[in-house]
Amino acid sequence: MSEKRKSNKIIGIDLGTTNSCVSVMEGGQPKVIASSEGTRTTPSIVAFKGSETLVGIPAKRQAVTNPEKTLASTKRFIGRKFSEVESEIKTVPYKVAPNSKGDAVFEVENKLYTPEEIGAQILMKMKETAEAYLGETVTEAVITVPAYFNDSQRASTKDAGRIAGLDVKRIIPEPTAAALAYGIDKEGDKKIAVFDLGGGTFDISILEIGDGVFEVLSTNGDTHLGGDDFDEVIINWMLGEFKKQEGIDLSKDNMALQRLKDAAEKAKIELSGVSSTEINQPFITIDANGPKHLALTLTRAQFEHLASSLIERTKQPCAQALKDAKLSASDIDDVLLVGGMSRMPAVQAVVKEIFGKEPNKGVNPDEVVAIGAAIQGGVLGGEVKDVLLLDVIPLSLGIETLGGVMTPLVERNTTIPTQKKQIFSTAADNQPAVTIVVLQGERPMAKDNKEIGRFDLTDIPPAPRGHPQIEVTFDIDANGILHVSAKDAASGREQKIRIEASSGLKEEEIQQMIRDAELNKEEDKKRREASDIKNEADGMIFRAEKAIKDYQDKIPADLVKEIEEQIEKVRQAVKEDASTTAIKAASDELSARMQKIGEAMQAQSASAANAQGGPNINSEDLKKHSFSTRPPAGDNSSSTDNIEDADVEIVDKPE
């Protein structure tokens, strides 16, 4: 079979906490691509079941029976230290552990997986979805991230794309992508707010659009606020109600919790359209008196009360974003709603309260981000003309200076790409070296901000305190990823650092993970093909036994015996885990035997027609029991080994 030709398309991927979506420019218009399951969004879930790695809908379907090996909402852990995710760990059934560098990783069957690896599995699924639609190999993508993602989270997302075999041309914030999708065909100047409440994060961005220029004026948000948190308040309510009714605490039962998670998500969605919903979970647990059932009614008013503190948390970031943009709510022409949680009536009411106007509901909150990413892909690929995107950094960047002070070099909401330089000096006489501690955040003291990297500038010539001239340069690229350098004017000595993902994956390790992913892809494909052949064999046995039962009195006894013997051969081949070739051969032989049923029945039908003047066998039944089709083998990529390394890559460049 010939290789697919390489596509010149740059696809757009919304890598979401709960769901992901892929889009591509086609004929000058963005198109959302449906998955192999026929859905326009794919659950951002990866599961490990035996030797198989499941992604998307298949992973979600088995989550209740396999909670500890089903990884959902992993985006909340990407680019973060274990010490930063205590609250998130409490909400997931799988094991989150620190690796040797203190990064948050997932432990499944004594194997560690980084959030980048799991993200890569989802991105591979999106890549394959696009390739199946285009009929070409896709190698380039624009991937979206929450606007309030910090530098290491952005770098981690880019690494996930590379592991998935994608050249990530640009990382852009989700609200910015949504604004692109909204404003690409709009005329005139407008100031818009994008209110993005997704599965795991909340972002608010203020933009000015006009004449093809999309300028982000400010951005703010909360990376710990999203649909998962709304699910959690319903789960806690259900746990409390069930404990009151039955005296049983379900909070330590992972299988029950996964069922409650699914029920909470379903109830949350339903309550956006109805005033109350029934939650029924039969046989949720069992005690000495027998099985117990959970049956509750949750009203919209109750849910809004339970979630009131979460909804309230969206107000302050909106106020800050308006303040940073030097605008009032009345200056905003339109408010876009993005993310599944923006469908909640109480959320929409708060948006109206904040901005003093009804929000725009003309975009699909589940798809608009992927559409915007595809448009940006079109801009980068030259397919979309006369569009300029001016983005900003969400948090200030600086270094630690004397007294443990955070000295910003680049203020938040600075348009990127950008470069800033500042001269620093030593704090002691004859100081031979300085440590450059790179920080991100808004607090005045260094310890209260996030350290995203550090490096040493050594061999500074002896000089009195304050005399050496050390030029520190911050260079931020269009992806919002930071490069820092420090140069001593006297010696010409310079050191540089690229702020890496906190997982600390080195370049060669990323390349190894890419190679591993490709190797595992072929192995997993073989496993999937073997699984499909076994499933088809089981189906063939079922159809053959049903055909014998239905038509035993219409076919010769020796044929019945022949088929029963072949059924047993197929069953034994499957049971003994024979080779796929042997199972397929036995199944094909059974299929041939089953065709004899049709031939025998047709002969009997013809004989009856001659004797009685007409047929007496239903032709649809003949088709149903005489033929089988083998579905095409699927494809699924297994995960790569966990790799750990230092937080940053240091390059010495002495002059």
Curated annotation (Swiss-Prot):
Q: Which residues carry this modification: Phosphothreonine?
A: 201
InterPro entries per UniProt? ATPase_NBD, Chaperone_DnaK, Heat_shock_70_CS, HSP70_C_sf, HSP70_peptide-bd_sf, Hsp_70_fam
Instruction: Give the highest taxon in the source lineage.
Output: Bacteria
Pfam families assigned: HSP70 (PF00012)
Q: What else is known?
A: Expressed early during infection.
Role played? Acts as a chaperone.
Q: This chain belongs to which protein, by name?
A: Chaperone protein DnaK
Q: Which organism is it from?
A: Chlamydia muridarum (strain MoPn / Nigg)
Q: What is the lineage of its organism?
A: Bacteria, Pseudomonadati, Chlamydiota, Chlamydiia, Chlamydiales
Whichever gene encodes this chain, its name is dnaK
